A protein has these predicted regions:
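C-terminal catalytic "cap/lid" subdomain
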Residues: 1-256
């Protein structure tokens, strides 16, 4: 493959009233498949939602305060999150295959690093080698922090994880799918292009609900990549991956 992208899908984009939105995952599967076969682009996905799924399984209406309980929710929810992505991505993959008259097989892989592993040079190198190996074979790696074994992970956001992965892989771009259209100005209008993340840009940020990151963490992630010359696209998952990449009127592009 000529190109490599990292796609981060926020919890708020995947869940609708506490349940997995399979249409979002199907459209994502279609998008990454089309990019693979028509634009020589491999995709690495950074996913989240294990804790929320585990909360549902364990009967929690809101996030428990106890970190061990949060970790338990992550352990219960992580297998279900992978199952959901397998089903959803496969639906999009199969739709593309049918349109093109192809016989294709979807394979996904799961990577659950801890923050400490990413900070360790040898372990980080091994993680990256595995991601590139799978991506080059057409496998779609799904990455999530390993909340279930490291109590420090449950309070971290996956925007930062996505940026670190994109930087380490020297990806061609990071796409952050969320439930808003991108960065909005003080009047609620979409900011289509940002070339520098300064105090004026940071002042436009707000928080969010179920996830651990809001627009602030997305800008922090983009700022990290800006220094590396890697562009970041932030946009609403409802438009689909392809439209966000192609149409500058529906997303925020952060690039020099």
């Amino acid at each position: 493959m000529r190109y490599l992208q990292v796609v981060k899908i926020g919890t708020s984009s995947v869940f609708n009233n506490g349940a997995i939105d399979y249409l979002v995952l199907s459209n994502l599967g279609y998008g990454v498949t089309k990019l693979r076969f028509e634009r020589e682009t491999s995709s690495v996905l950074v996913v989240s939602g294990a804790i929320l799924l585990g909360m549902g399984e364990k009967g929690f209406a809101k996030k428990p305060d106890d970190k061990m309980e949060l970790q338990s929710c992550a352990r219960v929810g992580q297998p279900k999150l992978m199952d959901a992505y397998d089903i959803g991505l496969r639906a999009g993959y199969d739709r593309y295959s049918k349109e093109k008259g192809l016989s294709l097989r979807l394979l996904i892989s799961q990577v659950l690093p801890t923050y400490h592993q990413l900070d360790n040079t040898a372990e980080r190198r091994n993680i990256v080698a595995g991601l590139l190996h799978d991506a080059n074979q057409g496998i779609i790696p799904l990455i999530n922090y390993n909340d279930g074994v490291d109590p420090t992970e449950v309070t971290r956001d996956n925007d930062n994880l996505a940026a670190r992965i994109a930087k380490t892989l020297v990806a061609d771009r990071l796409v952050i799918l969320t439930d808003v259209d991108g960065l909005l100005d003080a009047d609620g209008r979409l900011v289509r292009r940002v070339s520098e993340i300064n105090d004026d840009v940071r002042a436009l940020c707000n928080g969010n609900g179920n996830g651990t990151g809001g627009m602030k963490t997305k800008l922090e992630a983009a700022d990290l990549l800006l220094k590396e010359g890697i562009p970041t696209i932030i946009g609403n998952s409802k438009y689909g991956l392809l439209k966000l990449i192609e149409n500058e009127d529906v997303r925020t592009l952060i690039s020099r």
